[in-house]
Amino acid sequence: MRVKITLACTETGDRTYITKKNKRNNPERLELKKYNPRLRKHTLHREVK
């Protein structure tokens, strides 16, 4: 089952990105390096509830 998740920046806390993931294949929290427009650089974004 695919569910919508929100990705929050670890440096500023901004929630800029929304994506989907399969909870059966990836039960742990998703971490991706994404672009943060406020800082103008790539930062680590983590899945939040």
UniProtKB/Swiss-Prot annotation:
- Give the record's keywords alphabetically: Ribonucleoprotein, Ribosomal protein
Gene Ontology biological process terms from the UniProt entry: translation
Q: Name one GO molecular function term.
A: structural constituent of ribosome
Q: Which GO terms describe its cellular component?
A: cytoplasm; ribonucleoprotein complex; ribosome
- Family membership noted in the UniProt record: Belongs to the bacterial ribosomal protein bL33 family.
NCBIfam families in alphabetical order? PRK00504.1, PRK00595.1, rpmG_bact
Protein name in the entry: Large ribosomal subunit protein bL33B
Organism name: Exiguobacterium sibiricum (strain DSM 17290 / CCUG 55495 / CIP 109462 / JCM 13490 / 255-15)
